Amino acid sequence: MKRVAFVFTQGPHGNAGGREGLDALLATSALSEDLGVFFIGDGVLQLLPGQQPEKILARNYIATFGVLPLYDVERCYLCQASLQERGLSQVTDWVLDAEVLAPDALGQLLAGYDAVMTF
């Protein structure tokens, strides 16, 4: 089976990218065990705790990221530079356990995947 990476680059709730990416990730997890999940740029905002999307009449799908380990999705990464740019370096209570890596390290990991899906 191919190694598939899912890259989240957009913030939550402004468009359907994050929700659609999560749906695709969950569907793919039933077919493959070799998945990686990367949060880069505004994508790091997907994992912020305490979001209140109902205030803008949006569906709260963020908590679903927290159940990814139940689907054997365990390789999750946050971009260190993206966190710093957004003043989030000190946040530790993400909705999903993810390893914080420098952009170069993320690039090396991504290069090892056969397919990369970006949302």
UniProtKB/Swiss-Prot annotation:
S-S bonds: none
Q: Which SUPFAM superfamilies match?
A: DsrEFH-like (SSF75169)
InterPro entries membership: DsrEFH-like, Sulphur_relay_DsrE/F-like, Sulphur_relay_TusC, Sulphur_relay_TusC/DsrF
Tell me which domain of life the UniProt entry assigns to the organism this sequence originates from: Bacteria
Q: Where in the cell is it found?
A: Cytoplasm
One GO BP annotation here?
tRNA processing
GO (cellular component) term, any one = cytoplasm
- Where would you find the membrane-spanning parts of this chain? none
Q: Which Pfam families match?
A: DsrE
Keyword list (alphabetical) reads: Cytoplasm, tRNA processing
The record's principal subcellular location, in a coarse class, is: cytoplasm
Family as reported in the entry's similarity comment: Belongs to the DsrF/TusC family.
Role, per record: Part of a sulfur-relay system required for 2-thiolation of 5-methylaminomethyl-2-thiouridine (mnm(5)s(2)U) at tRNA wobble positions.
**Subunit architecture:** Heterohexamer, formed by a dimer of trimers. The hexameric TusBCD complex contains 2 copies each of TusB, TusC and TusD. The TusBCD complex interacts with TusE.
In Swiss-Prot or TrEMBL terms, this protein is called: Protein TusC
From what organism does this protein derive? Serratia proteamaculans (strain 568)
